[in-house]
Each structure stands twice: as C-alpha cells, then as structure tokens.
Amino acid sequence: INNAGITKDNLFLRMSDEEWLDVINTNLTGTFRVTKLVAKIMLKARWGRIINISSISGIMGNQGQTNYSASKAGMDGFTRSLAKELGARNITVNSISPGFIETDMTHVLPEAQKESLLSQVPLGRLGSAEEVAGTVAFLASEEASYVTGTTLHVNGGMYMA
C-alpha cells in the first residue's frame, strides 16, 4: 500500500523548484521505488495486490496545489499502466482517491473553508480514515481479484466518474 504523501501548497507562479520536487519525489517517485521492490517479490509468487492512495485533487485539481495534483494524477496513470504490465501474473494494481477526510490536516482548516468544502459533498460530511481503510481492505481481498487498473473514489459524491 503506497500511502506516503506530502503537500507544499503555493500558487504556481510562486512555487519554488524545491516545493515542486519535494512533493513529486515523495508522492510519485516514492511510489515508483517502493512498488519496484515489492513487484519483484509478487512476480515470483505470481500473486499480489498493489494499492496506491491518490487524491481527489489528482482528478479535479486544486488551486495552489499544482505539485500535489500532478503527483496524484500521475499516481492514477501509474496504476493503470502497471495493472496492464502485471495482470498476467495475477497481480492487481488499483488506486483509491479519497476526498476530504477527517484528519489533522482538515482539523486546522478555517471553519468557512470547511463549510465551503462540505457544500460540494452530497453526503454533507467529511469522510473517515476507517472508510478509506475499508476500501483498502476490499481491494486487498479475494473479493477484488477481478478488479485492476481502476481508481475507486471515496469522497461522499464530491466527484462522480
């Protein structure tokens, strides 16, 4: 499960190369490196589950997050391409795209910003880490053995594919 992720938000024209690279290297290059290590083991076993945690920002974009959005969109493309490469060896590769989840990062948002975000979520609330974890558990299970190359959206309806 590739779940590492950082943000270093800034408007595009103010974003430094360091802010761009730190986010891309952690979120996308880190996924590449970890997956490369575990894929070799999975190939030998002829079975595996690779689950990448992307973000609604990779699908919808988000002002001040060109680096983060690009890294998470890249992760979804990585997921689809790798699923095509590894599927013949009984290895599934999927991603989960959480929306706004109740975390330390969302706790510090100003109340007006939280209300604005929630107005875009048909279910009218933030998601929980347990709801994302339940989706991970499903993708890791035998019940998901015919699911590969897809992104599951866990966002209360904020984005509907």
List where the protein language model places each region:
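A conserved structural motif in NAD(P)-dependent oxidoreductases
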Residues: 121-132, 143
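Residue(s) in the substrate-gating loop at a strand-loop-helix junction
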Residues: 55
